Curated annotation (Swiss-Prot):
Subunit and interaction comment: The complex is composed of six subunits: RnfA, RnfB, RnfC, RnfD, RnfE and RnfG.
GO BP annotations listed: electron transport chain
Major subcellular site: membrane
Function: Part of a membrane-bound complex that couples electron transfer with translocation of ions across the membrane.
Top EC category: translocase
UniProt xrefs under InterPro entries: Ion_transpt_RnfA/RsxA, NqrDE/RnfAE, NqrDE/RnfAE_oxidrdctase
Topology in membrane: Multi-pass membrane protein
EC number(s) reported in the record: 7.-.-.-
Keyword Cell inner membrane carried by entry: yes
Signal peptide: none
Protein name (Swiss-Prot/TrEMBL): Ion-translocating oxidoreductase complex subunit A
Alphabetically ordered keywords of this record: Cell inner membrane, Cell membrane, Electron transport, Membrane, Translocase, Transmembrane, Transmembrane helix, Transport
Amino acid sequence: MTELALILVSAILVNNFVLVQFLGLCPFMGVSRKIETAIGLSLATTFVLTLAAICSYILQRYVLRPLDLEFLRTIGFILVIAVVVQFTEMLVKKTSPLLYRVLGIFLPLITTNCIVLGVALLNANRAEYGFLEATTQGFGAGLGFSLVLVLFAALRERIAIADVPAPFRGAAIGMITAGLMSLAFMGFSGLIRP
């Protein structure tokens, strides 16, 4: 139980996939203008990350490894992620049509979000991870992505009404803000020993 808590804290704070490992930067910069959109995408991405971690673990453990087809791992994981994202898109469309319209093109683009494939591949490369550890890592990565995305959206909403000097407006202030957030998350680096 302690190990699962450490994996969760590590994925959320210490080794955050966005600010430390630089995965998932496209939606991080693209969907973070409004906090409502960021919350919706973060929930969908957390759901996809958790489900993709489960499905990719099952595929790796019970299909690819026993049949000695591990060279097909990346293609298999991409197919699994595409199916999970399609399922999520149908679920969001059915349960929240407004959120579906607000997210627009970003919902199907979760398929190409490198954080989803990155978590699946990192779980597959860790032989010591069992089912619960892989699922916890996927869920923690989703929570970490959600935390960073919502915090960044809140900061960008405040910056949008602030008096920013002309050379720093737009993407420049966004990158500076992301860099400062990354520095803040570096403070968690000593929290868990490797």
